[in-house]
Regions:
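Active-site-proximal mixed secondary-structure blocks
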Residues: 1-121
Length: 121
């Protein structure tokens, strides 16, 4: 897209993660081998409510001055290029709006340029 290597990420507006993504030009996308139980907790508990990173015994590290996890197998460091909110009038399948957005808390879509890729051997 736009002659760049990009990723697309989606975050609901109430997610604590959104505050971190919005506060910086860059963010990380971290991918893991295993850690199913830990990742399930990270996806269901808010960092506003408890220190979930500590609870799962993950460790923050920085790559290109961007926070990520030491436990990640693959990390993309990306720079935001574009952000917009999913628009209900753009759904072709309108059942998605009804089923997935009863609170009308539409995801924010971020398009970001891949700056670096790190693979842990």
């Amino acid at each position: 897209l736009w002659n760049k290597d990009v990723v697309t990420a989606y975050i609901r507006p109430q997610r604590y993660t959104k505050e971190f993504v919005d506060s910086q030009d860059c963010f990380s996308l971290s991918f893991f081998d295993g850690y199913k139980k830990e990742l399930s907790l990270l996806g269901t508990v808010s960092g506003r409510d408890q220190n979930k990173i500590e609870d799962v015994d993950f460790h923050i590290t920085y790559l290109d001055n961007v926070p990520t996890f030491q436990e990640a197998k693959l990390v993309f460091i990306v720079e935001k290029l574009y952000a917009d909110t999913i628009k209900p009038e753009c759904f072709i399948d309108h059942t998605i709006d009804e089923q997935c957005y009863p609170q009308k808390d539409y995801h924010i879509m971020y398009i970001a340029k891949i700056k670096s890729v790190y693979v842990q051997e």
